[in-house]
From Swiss-Prot:
Binding of substrate, residues: 28-31, 83-86, 96-99, 123
Lineage, uppermost ranks: Bacteria, Pseudomonadati, Pseudomonadota, Alphaproteobacteria, Hyphomicrobiales
Keyword Isomerase: yes
HAMAP family per record: Rib_5P_isom_A
Keyword annotations: Isomerase
Catalysis performed (reactions): aldehydo-D-ribose 5-phosphate = D-ribulose 5-phosphate
GO biological process: pentose-phosphate shunt, non-oxidative branch
Gene of this entry: rpiA
Subunit structure: Homodimer.
Name of the molecule in the record: Ribose-5-phosphate isomerase A
Sequence similarity: Belongs to the ribose 5-phosphate isomerase family.
Amino acid sequence: MDARQMKIKAAEAALEHVESGMRLGIGTGSTAEEFVRLLAEKVASGFQISGVPTSERTARLCLELGVPLKSLDELPELDLTIDGADEVDGKLRLIKGGGGALLREKIVASASTRMIVIADESKVVDVLGAFKLPIEINPFGQVATRLAIEKTASRLGLAGEIVVRSSGDGVFMTDGGHLILDASFGRIPDADALAVELNAIPGVVEHGLFIDVASMAIIAGPEGARTLTAS
């Protein structure tokens, strides 16, 4: 089973948790896109949901495939969000934001009664941090903000390169018009403390540490999909 097949397996298992009539947050990224494709097939057969996308990219795919969408302002309370993750640990703490949609992903997930994470087994880690931590910042004062992040990380015993994310045509900009810093801290022994400290930096809009947000994770491997709950 290759990587895409595992993503499809996780998405199939997640789809079993979606009930007709649900207000559904729809994530961003390659695994979430497999979920959207499967959801669209079900919608085409008469299944009723109202989706709230976490990015313009997801919105475009949903509209292309016929998945009905609403804005979060129209549906401010959601039943369930299904989204991918770049890393997930045994306490269901996540690193997200590899696709650049972390702010909207966190807003939508926080507006949901439950969040189910879908991923392949390569994303499961003992300690978060092998994946670069995305930190969304305001463009104004970006150098000062990066310096504040470096000092904060140092106080917590973390160090590593922090770079502005680029795209094919220059600096990457989020859907909200912000920059993303990718922080190569390595292992983050106290993700909870880092999340609190990053939240206190004025120029930080959001960060990719999702703490106490996910309700469960569906992890796909060569033998099929399994469910993780917080240990």
